A protein has these predicted regions:
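Amphipathic, hydrophobic secondary-structure cores in small proteins
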Residues: 32, 56-59, 69
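Conserved amphipathic alpha-helical interaction elements at protein-protein interfaces in regulatory
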Residues: 16, 23, 41-44, 78
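A short, surface-exposed loop/turn module that caps and links secondary-structure elements
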Residues: 37-64
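GIY-YIG nuclease signature motif recognition
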Residues: 10, 35, 72
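Arg/Lys-rich, positively charged N-terminal/basic patches that mediate binding to nucleic acids
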Residues: 1-32
Length: 99
């Protein structure tokens, strides 16, 4: 089973999304649980996400008609996943420059 860790950018993204949801009266806990469940699936299926640029992968996390995207890297030798960033599908892009 792959180990999962979060970059400081991904943690900041979760906080930003949480703040947005709570300010707009949306169910923050339900959304964060949904993201957590999707990321946990990657422990058993680390290549589940679609290929992205620079050898990275994107996990699409559906929530009704919309959802979220988690950008991550997977290191086969270490069996380790690093979640680099998380955004809403309607956002134009990730909020930080990703190497």
């Amino acid at each position: 089973m792959a180990k999962i860790s979060y970059s400081s950018q991904a943690l900041a993204d979760l906080e930003r999304l949480s703040d947005f949801l709570s300010r707009n009266g949306l169910n923050t806990l339900e959304t964060l649980d949904l993201i957590d469940e999707a990321v946990t699936i990657m422990t058993r299926h680390p290549l589940i996400g679609r290929q992205a640029e620079s050898g990275l992968r994107e996990l699409v996390i559906s929530q009704g008609r919309t959802g979220y995207v988690a950008l991550y890297s997977y290191e086969l030798e270490q069996d380790a996943i690093l979640v680099l960033a998380i955004r809403h599908q309607r956002e134009a892009g990730f909020h930080a420059q990703i190497p």
